């Protein structure tokens, strides 16, 4: 797993007035404030979560 790919994402939008499931998805991505950056493994599950809230996050870096 030394070669495991990671992805950095940044929250750029607020979850205010968004559906509850989108808020929960942001929490699952370890994001809770605008401007926060988190690094997660690049898996299909994480990619799916990013797709669900693509309007609230941006990909900063892919390794």
Curated annotation (Swiss-Prot):
One MF term in the entry's GO annotations: structural constituent of ribosome
Disulfide bonds, paired cysteine numbers: none
Xref: InterPro entries: Ribo_uL30_ferredoxin-like_sf (IPR036919), Ribosomal_uL30_bac-type (IPR005996), Ribosomal_uL30_ferredoxin-like (IPR016082)
One of the record's GO cellular component terms: cytosolic large ribosomal subunit
Gene Ontology process terms (BP): translation
UniProt keyword Cell membrane present: no
UniProtKB keywords: Ribonucleoprotein, Ribosomal protein
UniProt-listed HAMAP family: Ribosomal_uL30_B
Subunit record text: Part of the 50S ribosomal subunit.
Stated family: Belongs to the universal ribosomal protein uL30 family.
Protein name, as recorded: Large ribosomal subunit protein uL30
Species for this entry: Bradyrhizobium sp. (strain BTAi1 / ATCC BAA-1182)
Lineage: Bacteria, Pseudomonadati, Pseudomonadota, Alphaproteobacteria, Hyphomicrobiales
């Amino acid at each position: 797993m030394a070669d495991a790919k990671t992805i950095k994402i940044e929250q750029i939008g607020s979850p205010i007035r968004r559906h509850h499931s989108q808020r929960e998805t942001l929490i699952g991505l370890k994001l809770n404030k605008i401007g926060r950056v988190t690094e997660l493994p690049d898996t299909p599950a994480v990619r799916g979560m990013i797709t669900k809230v693509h309007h609230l996050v941006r990909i900063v870096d892919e390794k």
